[in-house]
């Protein structure tokens, strides 16, 4: 009897684990204040449909427990809505966070703005996605950010750990170029979706990908146990990998985008901590990469 109970418990646990295989936990917000309409139901349905599509789908073969799901936010601002054509033109702010080991703190893993998040959507549409046949703009957009975020997250836990997922993201981008929407093509815009994933996978940006692992896994994750050692690892990662990535591909915007959303965290890591010599080195490094955040970098020297 006990043996049967054990088997039943094991089967139950397997079932529970299976229910938590999804990788993402995305919160969607749709701001339609610029659109004059008396019926907001299409925007509410859009928000619910996107959340369901992103959160209920299993994007990889990897097993994620409920507590391991990547926390994300997708904030859409609708700038144009053509009801007759079911056409939306939006800007999107996409953010993903990563928990820090042994700390009640999450770190921004990705944060970027998509200025051409345009698509067609009719209320109560069912979103279907086949990776081998990209035929819908909205699902292509959502799949792009799902794969990109999962790939970057895996890079932060193992050196180049997200390569397979990121290659799928690149494959999607190449196939989505036939959809006729902006953001997918090379040379169209230096900050578009193609540019980001193409740069991220470029051989010259391997130091930037190594930075993801060293900064998070060897640096931030270590700080709860030993703040001094964690900060030293972060300094080494910045001075070695971030500097090399910027030097090897000075026209790449990835180091600038990264330092834009890391400025507050970097300031907190160094302000009032470490040696003055270390602070000066990090200040000079960050100024050389992203002088537009000078006010934040100045606080590092305090």
Segments (PLM) and residue ranges:
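Flexible, glycine-rich surface segments
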Residues: 161-251
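Start-of-domain marker
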Residues: 22-89, 100-102
